[in-house]
Amino acid sequence: MNSVLTSLRSPHIGRVKALHTSKGRKAANEFLAEGPQAVEAATKSKRFKITQMYVTETALVQFSKLLVTDPIVVSEKVMAAMSSVDNAQGILATCIKDALPDLNKLTADSNLLIYCHEINDPGNLGTIIRSAHALGAQGLVLSPGSVDPFAPKVVRASAGSLWHLPFVVNIEFEELVRSAQEVDMKSIAMTGSGKKVLNDFIKVLPKKSVFIFGNEAHGLPIEISKKCDHQVRIPMKAGAESLNLATSAALVIYAASNALSPIE
């Protein structure tokens, strides 16, 4: 049986905790997969491969089928020190940050993309990644100023979908539009002031579309909305507050994906 790492002064703790920060992830070119769901996704994917696993003695038995590399067995206290959450699940892995897809290839190969302008809530981004993967979008594009998709909370909220959905980061809106126009992909601004209603627009949805979503607090800048091919809104009952960004994105992704290719 593997010896158990018990020292809270171990350099392994510092290495893992560094990945809690954007600076640490960039320096190491790695990120964290925490919990059995994320680790399992990492073991099954060709993207973002595992570089090192850490497990507690209990998890060594409980999650034995997930151990694709020789793990370092750690005490509960060491696992707690490594984890970014209060209730560590006994297993985590460091994963390599592979090169992300080329934007032009992504627009060429996709019929349905999502663009998020300066999204800053990691839970929202993780949920959008999960919804996009589950409901049929082919990829996600993030603007500069958006939250890091490799941040621990984003990875957790994606529920493993981070390993499946192609995405690119630090793409200005103008760059996205140029790439989309090359392949006749239409840009669709999702805004509360949109003249077109989603229910009707979906019936005439372009064969290649990228839906543009704004920041949680400020929405989509007018200058971006005006440059889109279409401005669309989600109809709501009078008096209702605007929907959460992740909820809006899920509704749009489902409707658009189902219109392009019915989900079964």
Report residues per predicted region:
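N-terminal positively charged helical leader segments and presequences
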Residues: 1-86, 186
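Short loop/helix-cap segments at secondary-structure boundaries that form the rim of catalytic
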Residues: 61-68, 105, 222-226
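Acidic/glycine-rich phosphate/pyrophosphate-binding loops and surrounding catalytic core
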Residues: 86, 90-108, 146
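Structured adenosyl-cofactor binding patch, chiefly the S-adenosyl-L-methionine
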Residues: 93, 131-135, 149-162, 222-264
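RNA substrate-binding interface of SAM-dependent RNA methyltransferases
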Residues: 103-195
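Active-site/ligand-binding-proximal alpha/beta "capping" segment
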Residues: 189-240
